[in-house]
């Protein structure tokens, strides 16, 4: 069942009150959404793909939690929070929010790439729904 999206402002306020906040010089957020262009077209350049009208999305919470724990082992990373939607989603719906906090920009950028990449590749299942015509 589709969930209500969290407030990034609230997440940032919570992060800045967290015990790790004095060590953090940068927070970086990611907001993945359902797009109309099929993954096959965007990632692989396949021509003639139908437009996406939605997606069925699910995830393995234990795997996500394990990946978050691994993210804390990266250099300079002191804060990580993830929210994932689920169920049948429409174009424009939020799929994922990620907030990463760390000491310096290169560490935080690398950690965001690492965390989002591992979640997308190891923890979620996405089934695109296409237009019929």
Regions found by a protein language model. Name each.
Residues 1-94, 101-133:
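N-terminal, polar/charged subdomain of small-to-medium soluble alpha/beta proteins
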